[in-house]
Regions:
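Short, hydrophobic transmembrane alpha-helix segments
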Residues: 19-27, 41-48
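Alpha-helical membrane segments and adjacent membrane-interface helices in multi-pass membrane proteins
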Residues: 33-42, 46-70
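Polytopic alpha-helical membrane-helix bundles and their juxtamembrane interface segments
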Residues: 1-24, 69-73, 80-189
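Short glycine/serine/threonine-biased micro-segments
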Residues: 30, 45, 154
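Hydrophobic alpha-helical membrane segments of integral membrane proteins
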Residues: 30-34, 52-56, 139-143, 161-163
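Generic detector of intrinsically disordered, low-complexity, polar/charged segments
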Residues: 29-32, 62, 85, 171
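Alpha-helical interaction segments
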Residues: 29, 48, 128-131
Length: 189
């Protein structure tokens, strides 16, 4: 598939999946699987190997998230993650970023291996938080999208970079909506 068409298709599916995640919709997961498979092919072609690994990880976690959200009935509760746990996740992600970035730098022709690795690791945390409906997922997505946009522009993936700017705004939207869901649940509504 030509790179441009692959980029359009990947972004189309993924854009809808990310929007539906902010809306707390189960359909985020199957659309995400399709988008991630398309993005894996795209990122492989532009030598963003940590992004390929991330997309394959997302395929698996989208399947798990789809299953988890599908077996829950009624209102899906949004909760918080303890600060100490977030600090631990962040420290672990930083350490693995350095290690994996070094491996990519030393053993492959990867482009921007440390930045690519940081996107990978902090996206992993964000994805697990999303799967468990933790409010803080949106803060991690804000960081990931902030770092990813210039990387994608640097690889001439303009459409992807622009879509990730949209994801950045969607993360703010998701944060707003999920705060409202959490507050409504706390009030017993």
């Amino acid at each position: 598939m030509e790179l441009m068409y692959l980029e359009y298709a990947a972004n189309g599916f993924y854009l809808l999946a990310v929007f539906l995640a902010a809306r707390n919709s189960i359909h985020t997961w199957w659309l995400g699987i399709i988008g991630c498979l398309l993005f894996a092919a795209l990122f492989y072609q532009v030598k963003l190997y940590a992004e390929v690994l991330l997309m394959l990880f997302f395929v698996v976690t989208n399947g798990i998230g789809w299953y988890q959200w599908g077996r829950q009935s009624g209102v899906k509760q949004v909760t918080n993650t303890p600060l100490w746990r977030l600090a631990g996740y962040s420290a672990l992600a930083a350490l693995v970023t350095l290690l994996y970035g070094y491996i990519l730098h030393s053993m492959t022709d990867a482009y921007a291996p440390f930045i690519d690795s940081a996107i990978l690791m902090f996206s992993v945390i964000a994805q697990f938080l999303l799967m468990n409906r933790k409010l803080e997922t949106w803060w991690f997505w804000l960081v990931v999208n902030t770092v990813a946009v210039p990387l994608y522009f640097s690889r001439e993936l303009q459409l992807t970079a622009i879509v990730y700017i949209g994801f950045w705004f969607n993360a703010w939207y998701g944060l707003y909506l999920w705060r409202a869901l959490r507050s409504a649940a706390a009030r017993g509504a």
